């Protein structure tokens, strides 16, 4: 049984997107900032809709995360 097998299909997508965001930023872990980006990338869940309704979008959050947290120091693959 995998770590995310008990998650809904949508939640599994969010985690995949979160991992992709973490790797894109050279991190070897998934932080809360990556989960937020994953939620926004998935785009169809209640959380994503609430964020969008408040004017919060993926591109802006991605830029803010990179400005606040920066990129990781190592290449992750």
Enumerate the predicted regions with their spans:
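Histone-fold recognition with a strong bias for associated Lys/Arg-rich disordered tails
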Residues: 1-77
